């Protein structure tokens, strides 16, 4: 074998000293990697961060083992340190002194069994040689080092896979996060574990969640800039706060093959057609004759405009609230429906929402505006006489389909509302009712509907997911008897079932006034959807009903 070239005079004794010096290095490694109880070689996953070197000090060869290892937690570290200390105290282990001369460039034949001294750090292509002679690739040995290899995929609920390669979060970064980003004044970390696209930290939250989140975020930006994103969430397993840090590159917005504006425009054109079709009773009875009688669609313009106005106000309110809270919305997709004209619009949130209150503001703004305009128009329809003096002749039994509309009809029309007696009303009633129904079905607390987001913002992820499952189940049962419910539950299941993307900080609850608005919206939507069970004519009450 060859030793590193030294500038010293050759002699046989110096060569023997060099060989003995390298032997001492081997014994130090043996002492540091042997199991203390049995003396057997330890199969530990190690990462050698330095190397063995030969140094010249005052004409002496000094062999130093400068290894820094990270053993697995199964070994007894204290006993290993004691054994290493005993060996290091022996002069035969620490150093070998040669008074005259220096090492030759090559060793004698007696030292041919020794291995070459590695004077360079291990590279990723090197292998780690175990004491018992088994060679393990360095890439396998590094798996036991505390370096997190994050799997490609959804970093958090609601996030989509965007990366083609995995993201590596080094141990040094995790240590900085634990020791310098988090702290006793914000979030005291007790443990951490890989969490899909990042690292989940468990611990104790200190102070108000919103203020603690702001402090942690500022420290994170000071250390790493915009490289990482912090989420402060509730662990659904134990309902305790957890902090999740993920690389921002895993949070890239989802891209689509078809431009959003093109798809949205296509859906919008079809929705206009179904809104017109919905307000032409002659075509409703025979849909196949629609294309042969397109001129009849002009009769549905006024009804389509009223319903579209209610839907439009709903979406405009979403946009204004989102602009006020810094939330970015995608292009709305209007969903056509031949039964009621439209199911409203599907609007994605494309950035990360700051907290639950901001989500509640945006989610509640649409139904609040839509319900307000629809309710006013419904009242006007009951109060104002038909413009042509004739109006629209209907069977009063239709009002039993909605508790809200049936109650208003009974309150305003009074004795004129009788079972089995035809009634002439202003068509504005039906137009406004359709707009209210569209807002109501979007207020169902399920998935990523407005109602689902409202429930999430008010009660958190765990409770809202249970409410969502219950709502979808009840909607599925009603789908057996109602075709509108059938198509709506199918649409929710395939397009809107969630989960809702994580918020930056999900712990702080909204203010009570916003919660009151959210509850009112859910109740109002329920009144629109539930049937009116009471007869309109008191004379038709039976003894059983009384």
Swiss-Prot record:
Residues 69-86 have a biased composition (Acidic residues). Pfam families: Peptidase_M50. It comes from the Eukaryota. Residues 89-110, 118-130 have a biased composition (Polar residues). Residues 67-143 are annotated as: Disordered. One of its GO terms (biological process) is proteolysis. Belongs to the peptidase M50B family. Probable membrane-associated metalloprotease that may be involved in chloroplast development. This is Probable zinc metalloprotease EGY2, chloroplastic. It comes from Oryza sativa subsp. japonica (Rice).
